[in-house]
Amino acid sequence: MDKQSASGEIPAMRWEPYHRRDPRNAKELSKTTSRGYFLDHLEDFDSQFFGISPKEAEQMDPQQRISLEVAWEALEDAGIPAKGLSGSDTAVFWGVNSDDYSKLVLEDLPNIEAWMGIGTAYCGIPNRISYHLNLMGPSTAVDAACASSLVAIHHGVQAIQLGESKIAIVGGVNALCGPGLTRVLDKAGAISSEGFCRSFDDEAKGYGRGEGAAAIILKNLSRAINDKDRILAVIKGSAVAQDGKTNGIMAPNAKAQQLVAQNALAVGNIDPLTVRYVEAHATSTPLGDPTEISAIAAVYGVGRDSQDPCFIGSIKPNIGHLEAGAGAMGFIKATLAIRKGILPPQANLNKLNSRIDWDKAGVKVVQEATKWPETDTIRRASICSYGYGGTVSHAVIEQFLPLSGLESLQTQSPDGPGVLLLSGPQQKRLSVQAETLRKWIAQDGRNHDLSSVLTTLATRRDHHDYRAAMVVESHDDAETALEALAKGADHPLVAQGRVLGTDIRKDVVWVFSGHGAQWTDMGKELLNNPVFYRAIQPLDELVQAEIGLSPIEMLLTGDFDSSDRVQILTYIMQIGISAVLKSNGVFPQAIIGHSVGEIAASVVAGALTPAEGALIVTRRAALYRRVMGQGGMILVNLPASQVEQELGQREDLVVAIESSPSSCVVAGDRDVVAQAAESFKERGVKTFTVKTDIAFHSPTLNGLIDPMLEALAEDLAPSTPTVRLFSTSLVDPRGQDLRDIHYWTNNMVNRVRLTSAVNAAVEEGYRIFLEVSSHPVVTHSINETLMDGGLEDFAVIPTLLRQKPTEKHILYSIAQLHCRGAEVDWKAQLPGPWADGLPTTTWMHKPIWRKIESAPLHTGLTHDVEKHTLLGQRIGIAGTNTTVYTTRLDNDTKPFPGSHPLHGTEIVPAAGLINTFMKGTGGRRLQNVVLRVPVAINAPRSVQVVVQEDQVKIMSRLLSDTPQATEDDSSWATHTTAYWARDIQEAVDPIDIAAVKKRLGTRIRDDFSINYLDQVGVSAMGFPWAITEHYHKDKEMIARVDVNPAVTGDAPLPWDSSSWAPILDAATSVGSTVFGTPALRMPAQIDRVDIFTSQDPPKIGWLYVEDASDAAPTSHVSVLNEAGEVVAKFTAMRFSEIEGTPGVSGSMESLVHQLAWPPATPAEEPLSIDTVLLVSSDAATMRQYANTIPRGVRSFEFSSVQDLISQDKSGLRLDKGTAVAYIPGEVQSLEEIPAASESFTWEVLELVKYIVKGGLPLKAFILTSNVGSGETPTALAQAPLFGLARIIASEHPDLGCLIDSENPVFPLTAMRYIQGADVIRINDDVARTARLRSLPRNKLHPASQPPRLLPRSEGTYLITGGLGVLGLETADFLVENGARRLILISRRALPPRRTWDAAPSDLQPTLAKIRNLESRGATVHILPLDISHPAAATQLSTALDTLSLPPVLGVVHAAGVLDNQLILETTRDAFTRVLAPKIAGALALHAVFPPNTLDFFLLFSSCGNLFGFPGQASYGAGNAFLDTLATHRARLGDAAVAVQWTSWRGMGMGASTEFINAELESKGITDVTRDEAFGAWLHLARYDIDHGVVLRSLAFDEGEPLPVSILTDIAVRRVGVAAAGDVPGTAAAGGADAIPSSGPELKVYLDEKIRGCVAKVLQMGAEDVDSKAALADLGVDSVMTVSLRRQLQQTLKVKVPSTLTWSHPTVSHLVGWFAEKVGK
């Protein structure tokens, strides 16, 4: 309204990455328009509000972030609680056109992460809104350039009109994160160099780009009226079109703009002359504005009187051109103009555009704020929006005029106090929200009726988990209460709390307490409440008729000191209070009555009428007069059981009430009670006197039973309760006895069992208790009971407090209920109109912006990796003889082509450092080369090569992740030093290669050095050299080397041919293998390195090595050309031995393992098992086991799991100490195996579900019969249970395990003493558990025999799963190793070859692979066959006969299906679908190719069944069968091998993803590359074994618990890493981080540690982690869950099961779990 313009300079941070990315950018950026309409803090986002981790938020386009916030604000402004839309068909259509952030982050290739895809996609903007609000309607991004958001509105209208959605959230967004499009628009002349929009102005020369977001909520008009919504305007019509072929695709078309406007008017049947205002697109371009005005004039200006123009305007000069968001912004401006009846003035307008004939146009620019003409019977406006690609859109809106009498629908709220609600997803938000609302109420809020404000907050806003509710009666009250909340001060009527946990029942138990709540004025104020009065008035008449006393009069006068009157008024008050609670929207879901309170409880539960309740209490009170003054009661702080034992059989003093586990009420004769009180006090036991002179619930009242039976004999007709009703008069609180006369005599004389009733409610899940009374009587007792049960998350709330305002305190109790998550029908309490204009959510923003780590590196600034040096930018130091080369080194710039790991970390080979020195100095001799510290590439580092006179050295420092870090933050390390000389004077004699070969005599294997290095842990070479001849004797060797065998003939090398590094790397490597004892050695010092030629090094040469060891391993290595001339030489190259670390180095020795079964370690404390439930369909085998169960252990037998379940339902006791033993039956033939295996596994799954879902305290064991031997069909059929058991142990770690025995002897000892195992094998009567170990040397395949597992050119090789990724890679490997005929079996057929070129794109990689195989000389046959089909063996045999190929010599079974499901969610169909290809498929192959008919039979299994990957029960079971089938065939002499693979990086069903990598890491292992996998195959080929486990172990800190015990023997420990106290179960003595042993201190400690782990994973502050919030709501996704498990395990030194965060979804839950584990 003030003609303000928001144009300004672009924030500096926006373009900063582009300055760094390329030096040329600076020049371009200096020419790019830097002014526009920018948000000051685009990077700010409240990620916590939406449960998005900062890590994920950083990967989200800011457009997604601000759209989320704006959409939320729009819903709040519309009075539509977002959570109420969950699961609805609500649509989201969002205009979006900018992908600046996407370009920014996705062009930073080394740092791309998984969530960046959806995080930067256009669709991610509406989809993110739909996802976070759980909306199920259409969710679409609309890209129509600058028309996008008005088109989105059009789509929203259509979705509602077509019935797709009832509500649509529509809008648009624009964010300018990069300079690219601005540069484009600069060159196109579309934007103004001054960064302003000057719509309609004569000086308009382009627009100023703007950013922001707009959201609009759409509803069908009739629905909005019915829902009592605030309707801002009505969309009468909208239209979208294209402007066709114009002078250019970006040129506007007036005719098209005119037609789309006419279409929109026609949709709404609107006369254009009734439209008073048009919000124009008005991009301020010389061509665009006149064109658009001509179109507007043609539609809206024709027929207009000059005094009655159509006004036009545009919001762009105020906020800029928001491009994709522009239409929505214009729509909002037009809507507000209609609503307020004022036309806003145009900004940045000095002189009207002279190219437009304004006098004839019939339209007029609004130059000053103008009141909407009153001549308009209804205000109407139109909005134009056009895209530069030709999209034209138009909408017509009008004023909403309420229907006559509509206001009468708005019921006015009652006067008096009400409840003001606030909430937030985190506790810290409440004070911020409170202060925001307080300021509003102090100013604008004064213009609103307070009840409408309360209604808005209660019924039109979302209620988050952290809540505050305050009872207020005026604006001043509200201000005071909000100020207290904002400042954290106490206020008697401000309730705060967190909703009970997500898995906790929120239903409320109303507890009606007994005698003792009375106080003088307890009902006086409530009598003014019409609801209260109406509820008790009929009862007042009844009581008067019975005893001549008026309860209402007694409440008014306070005359009710006697016990009989108190009894009556207790009932009356409870009935009245109940009515008031219900009128305020609070209802009970369960009820407990205590003493006389049971009467009102029964009435409210529907078991009695109010009149019946009044008769009971009145007539019983009359009888009480007979015993008044004779008795007494005291509350004693001792358990009822103890007091009862002390009292013995006394009748004059008894336990009358079991109040809580630690207190009770004693009743009896007056004097006896007084004496007892004194006695208890003398013992130091606290007692409290109950204000009564009657010994309720004691034998004193036995004399009243018959009179009471007589008094009520004909007057009660009890009903079945309609609300869950717990009894305190019956021994069983769940007893459903009718509340008849006998019940009430029992209620009078029997003990009150409050503790039992409360515990029964707790057992049924109730955690919220509301005491309905005039003052809390049992609240404390209920609290004690709940705390005694170990509960922490619960609420016990009183309704009234003595001497406190009753009306407000009932509301305060409701406020407290709401804060704990109880359901309150606020519309019942606040039925009136709601207010608009209340503040929306106050965002707690934090800057979140992706730091662009890498930038393209340019010549001269870094080293040339093809030259194999670290020589980067050369800097001469003025006035010195010093030259410095600087560069950056990381994985992308390593100066060697291969891999050179040491202990799992890539390092620059020594040859690369020497090459660097030679090239950097220009010298040909190095002396005293000292290799101090390897140059590691594990993290980016800055490297300097310093040449200072005759010295040279290499130094580096790590590059800090912190932008503010200075060079001093990371000290420089010196890696290598040397002295250099330019010329060599001495000559060197050639070496007679033939003579040396003859002298040595013995030619050894060409791969001797490679195998030697592989054996000691060197997994790969930095350069691809190969030895082609090798001779060795004693301390000499000579070897012919080819630095790149893949390059043949005259083809150029793939690097700079002048580099000496490749051949010198061969020299240092071969030179370390001359020593007799293999060890991992590195060059440490070299006396001299000489280069004797100025020519390039030879591609093929010879290495002459001499062992020159003295104190240390030392060698001389001469590099010869083919003529024997010495071209280079290492003199006295000394090596230092490095401690090997298998598993980290990556050698084949460390990648390939076998499964061993060493004896298990027994536990010190045995598991208690006194009862065994045997389950088996094989009665004979079950009887064998049963006969060996030791005496003293009970046993029961069941024919199936279903039999056990049915017996349980009929009353079988299943206590702690009971174990279920499932015994799969025997199988006689191979044909029975598939059905039997499926039956066995499914029975076990049913057993697990039965135990876990039922929460039964049982252990479960699976007892198999010698599966480990693989000898029999029984062993094969039971084998899948091995894999299944490991998955069960992973998902439910405390359940039990599988025990495999050679004989059917019941393994009770193993059950009791071998704890924490998943599979136990009993061999030679010794219990054993699995461990991974190195392959046994005694199993090496004799070198004299043909190699195993490799193809021969004359054979045929068959691969199942042949068209899968692994199948095709296997085919490639076999062809690479000589196979020439392949049969690829797949369930899918390929199209005819003639159609391959036209095949779908997703099939082309497969076809290309096959063509490649054929181009290399292989014949490939595709056999479409389901190998798991029952007839597969026959079909395969027939197909082989038809093909008439040479014999099949090798089979690879790589077929498989993966369908991950947690055990509790597994279905039989899904389980079988995965199991069949593994079992039936393997058996079909076994039948077609019996043992000893092939060269090899290779089965692709998985290490997942050894490590227990959660969700892979079916997959693990199937792979366990393959493992045993390999054993079975091997026992028969067959070359069968099962390979238990880890994940192949980027390939197959286990293709490495962020989630799979995290899951592997959580188990302590990692994936392998394709080359490593086939290297493992070749390594396995050297051994005669039936299985190999291929994986790489991670390194663990000393003292860190292993995630799985199977790694015990191969795990690598980082020695010396652990600090004092890091050993499991210990802490540094007296250290600051010592773990408390138990109690509250332990829980505080664990809460801090666990929140720290969560914060680390989420990349947020620990203070922002809410202990009671669901981890998923904090932003922990499936990938982060795995990372979190490892963090917890490392921090707390406790093994963490894979499903822990699923079953314990909050930090508080985790604290409880870890407290139990750490406590042990």
UniProtKB/Swiss-Prot annotation:
**Keyword field contains NADP:** yes
Q: Which residues form the active site?
A: C146 (for beta-ketoacyl synthase activity), H281 (for beta-ketoacyl synthase activity), H321 (for beta-ketoacyl synthase activity), H900 (proton acceptor), D1065 (proton donor)
Q: Where is this region: Disordered?
A: 1-31
Q: Which residues form the PKS/mFAS DH domain?
A: 868-1144
Annotated GO molecular function terms are: 3-oxoacyl-[acyl-carrier-protein] synthase activity; 6-methylsalicylic acid synthase activity; fatty acid synthase activity; phosphopantetheine binding
Q: Which residues form the Ketosynthase family 3 (KS3) domain?
A: 1-399
Among Pfam families, the record links this protein to: Acyl_transf_1, KAsynt_C_assoc, ketoacyl-synt, Ketoacyl-synt_C, KR, PKS_DH_N, PP-binding
Malonyl-CoA:ACP transacylase (MAT) domain: region residues: 509-823
Query: Record's GO cellular component, any one?
Result: cytosol
Q: Which GO terms describe its biological process?
A: fatty acid biosynthetic process; patulin biosynthetic process
| PROSITE patterns referenced in this protein's UniProt entry, alphabetically | CARRIER, KS3_1, KS3_2, PKS_MFAS_DH
Q: Identify the stretch(es) annotated as C-terminal hotdog fold.
A: 1001-1144
For this UniProt entry, which segments traverse the membrane? none
EC number(s) on file: 2.3.1.165
Q: Give the residue ranges for region: Product template (PT) domain.
A: 1148-1545
Stored InterPro entries: Ac_transferase_dom_sf (IPR001227), ACP-like_sf (IPR036736), Acyl_transferase_dom (IPR014043), Acyl_Trfase/lysoPLipase (IPR016035), Ketoacyl_synth_AS (IPR018201), Ketoacyl_synth_C (IPR014031), Ketoacyl_synth_N (IPR014030), Malonyl_transacylase_ACP-bd (IPR016036)
- What UniProt keywords are attached to this protein's entry? Cytoplasm, Multifunctional enzyme, NADP, Phosphopantetheine, Phosphoprotein, Transferase
Where in this protein does the record put region Dehydratase (DH) domain? Answer: 868-1139
- Keyword Transmembrane helix among record annotations: no
Q: What does this protein do?
A: 6-methylsalicylic acid synthase; part of the gene cluster that mediates the biosynthesis of patulin, an acetate-derived tetraketide mycotoxin produced by several fungal species that shows antimicrobial properties against several bacteria. PatK catalyzes the first step of the pathway which is the synthesis of 6-methylsalicylic acid via condensation of 1 acetate and 3 malonate units. The pathway begins with the synthesis of 6-methylsalicylic acid by the polyketide synthase (PKS) patK via condensation of acetate and malonate units.
Identification of the protein by name: 6-methylcalicylic acide synthase
Organism in which the protein naturally occurs: Aspergillus clavatus (strain ATCC 1007 / CBS 513.65 / DSM 816 / NCTC 3887 / NRRL 1 / QM 1276 / 107)
Gene this chain is encoded by: patK
